[in-house]
Swiss-Prot record:
Protein name (Swiss-Prot/TrEMBL): ADP-L-glycero-D-manno-heptose-6-epimerase
Keywords: Carbohydrate metabolism, Isomerase, NADP
Disulphide bridges: none
Organism phylogeny: Bacteria, Pseudomonadati, Pseudomonadota, Betaproteobacteria, Burkholderiales
Role: Catalyzes the interconversion between ADP-D-glycero-beta-D-manno-heptose and ADP-L-glycero-beta-D-manno-heptose via an epimerization at carbon 6 of the heptose.
InterPro entries: Epimerase_deHydtase (IPR001509), Heptose_epim (IPR011912), NAD(P)-bd_dom_sf (IPR036291)
Keyword Chloroplast: no
Catalytic site positions: Y138, K176
Residues that bind NADP(+): 10-11, 31-32, 38, 53, 74-78, 91, 142, 168, 176
């Protein structure tokens, strides 16, 4: 049996599908369906059981779970603007710690979601404490358990892998609202208003030039499955493409894919701006000093751990995503 927490969420539901594609259906899906619409992310998935996150936590504390092959822990509060530190640390740190202790006691492989938010304003994205300067309590909540893992690496009884997700986009993120990917928001803006809005230049970046390491959720699933297949690998690893691309590239991929749907030719960035299809708005004052203007994963450790598959660039991955979303309409 494999446990997937956050199973009705974005990455979690895609992980369940990835397991299903391998013929694995002995899955315990764990989530909080207070937002009932999230059930839609599990409708086409095959699972053995569903547990509410609170019931699951009690079972972990009581040691009342069946024999497990692995735990893929994706459940967390992912709202980077959440200010309630007590809530954030309980959901993102304390629950992870409890699951870790259970898995170590039972010798069960444990893969968990960390985040590139641990790097904060750093300009170096290598898995090293010298580079970890979170800008918000979300990033700190993720860093805390990474630090625990480092102190326990020499005494592990089973695999533990923390994956620092960079900017993930793809199917089944619609429930995330404002925390959904920029690709999702660009797509909906263009369909509703006929143009896409991006932040104007700030912090030394040109209009729309702020850059992130955007990674398709399909590649995130592939990384998770790689470690599931290689239980001898443990540690904290960046989960990105190793390629920073500007928000302009995401918007252009969205707009040109939707234009192609109408039989219209792709346009270069300058022409998209000239035609008003891409527009720039002032950078918000409340984000200054709290915003990562640039991220690019160093994937050296990931590649050294044996993950050799190529990863999608923005043009490929975002276009796939837009076509997938439009096919549902």
């Amino acid at each position: 049996m494999i446990v997937v927490t956050g199973a009705a969420g974005f990455i979690g539901s895609n992980l369940v599908r990835g397991l299903n594609r391998r013929g694995i259906q002995d899955i315990i899906a764990v989530d909080d369906l207070t937002d009932g619409d999230k059930f839609r992310n599990l409708v086409d998935c095959s699972i053995a059981d569903y547990l509410d996150k609170d019931e699951f936590r009690e079972r972990v504390r009581g040691g009342n779970l069946p024999a497990l092959r692995a735990v893929l822990h994706q459940g967390a509060c992912s709202d980077t603007t959440e200010r309630n530190g007590r809530y954030m640390l309980d959901n993102n740190y304390r629950v992870t710690l409890e699951l870790f202790e259970y898995c170590q006691a039972e010798r069960v492989p444990f893969l968990y979601a960390s985040s590139a938010a641990v790097y904060g304003g750093s300009s170096v994205y290598v898995e090293d404490p010298a580079n970890e300067h979170p800008l918000n309590v979300y990033g700190y909540s993720k860093l805390l358990f990474d630090q625990v893992l480092r102190t326990r690496m020499d005494s592990l009884t089973a695999q533990v892998v923390g994956l620092r997700y960079f900017n993930v986009y793809g199917p089944h993120e619609q429930h995330k609202g404002r925390m959904a990917s920029v690709a999702f928001h660009n797509m909906n803006q263009f369909l509703a208003e006929g143009h896409v809005r991006l932040f104007a230049g700030w912090d030394g970046y040109e209009d729309g030039g702020q850059s992130r390491d955007f990674i398709s959720v399909e590649d995130v699933v592939a990384v998770n499955l790689h470690f599931l297949d290689n239980p001898g690998q443990s540690g904290v690893f960046n989960c990105g493409t190793g390629r920073a691309q500007p928000f302009n590239d995401v918007a252009a991929a969205v707009v040109n894919t939707l234009r192609a749907e109408r039989g219209e030719a792709a346009l270069p960035l300058a022409e998209l701006v000239k035609k008003g299809l891409l527009r720039y708005i002032p950078f918000p004052d409340d984000l200054k000093g709290r915003y990562q203007s640039y991220t690019q994963a160093d994937v050296g450790r990931l590649r050294a751990a044996g993950f050799s598959a190529p990863m999608r660039d923005v043009q490929t991955g975002v276009s796939e995503y837009v076509r997938y979303w439009r096919a549902l309409k």
